[in-house]
Amino acid sequence: MTEKPKPTTAVERLEKLTGTDLHDLCDAAEAAIKGGGGFGWLSVPPRHIMEAYWRGVLLVPERQVFAARLDGTICGSAQLARPPRNNEAQALAAQLTSNFIAPWARGHGLARHLVLVVEDAASAAGFTVLNLDVRDTQAAAIQLYEGLGYVRWGTHPAYARVDGREIPGHYYFKRLGGEALPR
């Protein structure tokens, strides 16, 4: 019996779209949205809207977009958002946002790898804290973040509306570089 070859995985910063990147990114986002993990979207927007979103987010100077690939195909993404320039008091903290892996690509460690690459990029950019928030219904994401050392510091009881009902959302932070928390 021949063993199936192990798929190749990679995570990289996406600075421009080449080849089938835009198509793959839209397909992966669509699959994640349909699977309930659409980083804010609850229903799939028209394709031209999604394409404009991805083209546009790459142009935002305060954002870095990262892509996860399975066998060379984009299957997920995350963004590192810098604080606005007028918020000097919180210049130490960046935001991990818009994080997803398409359901068909889960189980290969890409979600973890994606978060770790974003953490490294945040640290390299001089940030000492990474913040994120997540809907209470995203159990796998919560398990991932808590397993990577993110600390839940609060819950908003009416964070989002899904299927006509309000659901809670949780706020997390992580000190980068292993710094101790202030006492």
Protein language model regions, located:
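Conserved GNAT acetyl-CoA-binding A-motif
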Residues: 115, 122-133
